[in-house]
Every structure is written in structure tokens, then in C-alpha cells.
């Protein structure tokens, strides 16, 4: 059985940067915290917890130490709270997310009603929205955008892991809603490239394995686009979840992974698939 690993499987630039910053901070003296999980990988979070890094939902009761801002970013109020408490702040916010936050702040300041294309419940979107000084709407599709009120000036940004197709559909609707529109494509290139690569791979294999946290938006989207082309697509977090029956009659298996999936997890999955194959041959 041939195992084909996608070239861009695993950590993206922003996640790699954030995890490096987190592990470096963990090695220093004093208490270290992250506001929410540093990335959407339970296994990486566990490793950091093993080094003494505590995951907090808020800073209530924290008077000293180092707080790491997760790769998805936090709200402006949470960042201000950390500064007010005189904590040492290690800002591991992905630069692409940071750019979206800055666009929202500037658009809002200039009198635009802001439309954020994304998932309203996602921490990245909640952080982006918090930088708006005026009206702001979150929409996840063109259909939702069609229900927006008419607006004089509209400014559009996107969650970094959104699909370009969704952004286009929302922009089309916003063109009908406002007299003036400004659009910033804040989708991370890595997201689109990974999805295109995964789709191409899914067409060429008999089975597709997508590795990443079940709480990871970009991993879930990878699994979705793969399953549209290859029904035998399986989304897993760890090698332990693999099932030998998935590979019956399979000659080529494709493997890809979300932007928050570490290399060691990918290696473990590939090793496990190889074990299944060796048993089959033996």
C-alpha cells in the first residue's frame, strides 16, 4: 500500500511561530499561562501543560507571571486586561490574524459598517470583532449576508481560514447593500493552498486520512473538501483512532493534516498505517 503525504501537511507559519514562542516562554522561571489553548491541538496543549503552562479562560485572580496570547488572538479587552495587570505579555497572535484585527479597527474608525466573514463562535472571529468601534456583523455565507440591512459604507474582512468562495459570495451580497464597499482579503494563503492540494490528492487515492484537532476549523474544512471527492475520508486526532478495516482494498492512501497538527503526530499516523500494511502482507 502506497502512502502519499501532502507536501504542506501540518504546522503553518503562524502556528509554528506561536508554538515556538510558547515553548520558549515555558522554559523561563515564573508562572506561565495561555489565554485559551495556544493552538487547536489538544496534544500540543498537553505537552505545554506538562511543562507547567496553565490554560486560562480569563485572567481573574492572576497578579503576576507571563501570559501567552494564543495564535487565534484574543479580544482587545482581554489584551488590555493583561497589560493593566502588569503581566509579561508574549503575543503569539498569528500575523495574518493581527492584520485582520487592524483592518477592522481602521475601517470602523473611518465610519464603515464592518462585515466579518466567518464563524461567530470561533475565538479568532471574536477577537477580530472586538476591534470594531461601531456596527459590526458576522456572516458565514452569502445567504446570511443577503439578510443584512442596507449600509452606506461597508468594510469586509474574513476569518483567515475561510474559503475564498464564501468570501466572494458575501462580497456579492454586500455590493447590493452598500453605496461604498472596501474589501480586504484576509484569508491566509496557506489555507487555500492546503485545500487545493488536499483536493488534488483526494482524487488520486482510495482512502484519505485527515489529521488534526476536532476543535480545529481548518482541519474540519480539509476533511469536508476531501470527503466531497473521496467518500472514504477519515478525520482523526491521533494514530490510536485508526482502524485497519478502513484500508481494506486500498492501494493508495492519502494523508494530510491541519495547520495545528505537529509533525510527530503525522509521523505516528504514518507508522501506524505502515503497521497495518505489514500485517496484511504477513
Curated annotation (Swiss-Prot):
Q: Name one GO biological process term.
A: isopentenyl diphosphate biosynthetic process, methylerythritol 4-phosphate pathway
Q: Under which pathway is this protein filed? A: Isoprenoid biosynthesis; dimethylallyl diphosphate biosynthesis; dimethylallyl diphosphate from (2E)-4-hydroxy-3-methylbutenyl diphosphate: step 1/1; Isoprenoid biosynthesis; isopentenyl diphosphate biosynthesis via DXP pathway; isopentenyl diphosphate from 1-deoxy-D-xylulose 5-phosphate: step 6/6
Keyword annotations for this protein, in alphabetical order, are:
4Fe-4S, Iron, Iron-sulfur, Isoprene biosynthesis, Metal-binding, Oxidoreductase
What residues bind isopentenyl diphosphate, as annotated?
Answer: 40, 72, 122, 216, 218, 260
Give the EC number(s) listed in the UniProt record: 1.17.7.4
User: What residues bind dimethylallyl diphosphate, as annotated?
Assistant: 40, 72, 122, 216, 218, 260
Query: Tell me, what's a Pfam family for it?
Result: LYTB
Protein residues bound to [4Fe-4S] cluster: 12, 94, 188
Family (UniProt): Belongs to the IspH family.
UniProt cross-references to NCBIfam families, sorted A to Z = ispH_lytB (TIGR00216), PRK01045.1-1 (NF002187)
**Which PANTHER family does this entry report, sorted A to Z?**
4-HYDROXY-3-METHYLBUT-2-ENYL DIPHOSPHATE REDUCTASE (PTHR30426:SF0)
Report the protein name in the record: 4-hydroxy-3-methylbut-2-enyl diphosphate reductase
Q: What is the lineage of its organism?
A: Bacteria, Pseudomonadati, Thermodesulfobacteriota, Desulfuromonadia, Geobacterales
What gene makes this protein? ispH
Amino acid at each position: 500500500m502506497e502512502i502519499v503525504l501532502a507536501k504542506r501537511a501540518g504546522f503553518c507559519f503562524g502556528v509554528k511561530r506561536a508554538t515556538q514562542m510558547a515553548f520558549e516562554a515555558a522554559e523561563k522561571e515564573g508562572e506561565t499561562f495561555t489565554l485559551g489553548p495556544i493552538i487547536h491541538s489538544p496534544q500540543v496543549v498537553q505537552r505545554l501543560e506538562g511543562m507547567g503552562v496553565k490554560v486560562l479562560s480569563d485572567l481573574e485572580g492572576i497578579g503576576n507571571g507571563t501570559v501567552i496570547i494564543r495564535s487565534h488572538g484574543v479580544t482587545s479587552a482581554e489584551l488590555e486586561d493583561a497589560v493593566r495587570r502588569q503581566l509579561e505579555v508574549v503575543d503569539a497572535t498569528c500575523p495574518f490574524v493581527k492584520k485582520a484585527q487592524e483592518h477592522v479597527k481602521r475601517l470602523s474608525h473611518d465610519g464603515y459598517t464592518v462585515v466579518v466573514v466567518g464563524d461567530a463562535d470561533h475565538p479568532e472571529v471574536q477577537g477580530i470583532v472586538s476591534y470594531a468601534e461601531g456596527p459590526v456583523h458576522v456572516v458565514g455565507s452569502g445567504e446570511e449576508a443577503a439578510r443584512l440591512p442596507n449600509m452606506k459604507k461597508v468594510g469586509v474582512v474574513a476569518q483567515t481560514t475561510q474559503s475564498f468562495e464564501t468570501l466572494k459570495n458575501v462580497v456579492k451580497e454586500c455590493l447590493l447593500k452598500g453605496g461604498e464597499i472596501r474589501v480586504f482579503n484576509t484569508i491566509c494563503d496557506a489555507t487555500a493552498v492546503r485545500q487545493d492540494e488536499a483536493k488534488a490528492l483526494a482524487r488520486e487515492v482510495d482512502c484519505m486520512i485527515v489529521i488534526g484537532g476536532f476543535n480545529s476549523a481548518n482541519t474540519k474544512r480539509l476533511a469536508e473538501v476531501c470527503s466531497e471527492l473521496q467518500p472514504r475520508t477519515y478525520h482523526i486526532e491521533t494514530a490510536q483512532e485508526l482502524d485497519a478495516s478502513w484500508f481494506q482494498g486500498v492501494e493508495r492512501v492519502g494523508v494530510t493534516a491541519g495547520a495545528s497538527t505537529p509533525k510527530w503526530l503525522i509521523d505516528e499516523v504514518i507508522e501506524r498505517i505502515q503497521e497495518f500494511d505489514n500485517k496484511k502482507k504477513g
